A protein has these predicted regions:
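Generic detection of short hydrophobic beta-strand segments and adjacent strand-loop junctions
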Residues: 3-9, 87-89, 142
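A residue-level signal for beta-strand positions that form part of recognition/binding surfaces
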Residues: 4, 68, 129
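Short, solvent-exposed secondary-structure boundary motifs
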Residues: 15, 50-62, 112-114, 119-123
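Hydrophobic alpha-helical transmembrane segments
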Residues: 41-53
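Conserved beta-hairpin
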Residues: 53-96
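Non-transmembrane, membrane-adjacent beta-strand/coil modules in membrane-associated proteins
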Residues: 78-141
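C-terminal/domain-terminus segments
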Residues: 142-159
């Protein structure tokens, strides 16, 4: 068996467009309120600190790895943050692979190994996902920003 990695993708928490826009809008609101407060009021300084804190946290979250997806050795390996366990999905037990939309909603929270209603979800950002169905009927939904390459790698490993 080869240990060669066919596909690797890293997904970071702070790089999703909509939450980043919300955080930056909050920071801009704090700066605007600080600008229009009187010099006598000390609450304006607190708003300046909050605005800069939001920006620093956003920058830090841009480098915070949520999870890494690898396809190698006829399996999909997903490992996440420090306290999460490695999830290994054996491709020999997969009966159906399809590319589909992750969710019908506009806003989706990042999840790792979320068990809900017969599905196991892994998602950080993007709109599309790979749906893997195993022999027992359990569906793995893995969100990806490179869905076509991920699908091609899985189908190549299953052959």
């Amino acid at each position: 068996m080869s240990e060669k990695t066919v596909f690797t993708e890293k997904q970071y928490l702070g790089r999703e467009f909509i939450p980043l826009t919300i955080r930056l809008a909050l920071a801009m609101f704090c700066f605007a309120v600080d600008f229009f407060t009187d010099e006598r009021e000390r609450s304006g300084d607190l708003l300046m600190v909050v605005g800069f804190s939001i920006i620093v946290i956003s920058i830090f979250m841009g480098f915070l790895l949520h999870f890494r997806t690898r396809v190698q050795n006829k399996s999909v390996l997903i490992d996440g943050l420090w306290t999460t366990r490695l999830v290994k999905i054996d491709l020999n037990s997969i009966v159906k692979v399809e590319k589909n939309v992750y969710s019908k909603y506009l806003f989706n929270n990042p999840v790792y190994n979320l068990h809900s209603k017969g599905t196991i979800r892994f998602f950080t950002a993007g709109k599309e996902a790979i749906h893997l169905t195993d022999r027992d009927g359990l569906v793995y939904i893995i969100g990806s920003q490179q869905v076509n390459e991920f699908l091609r790698a899985i189908e190549g490993e299953m052959k």
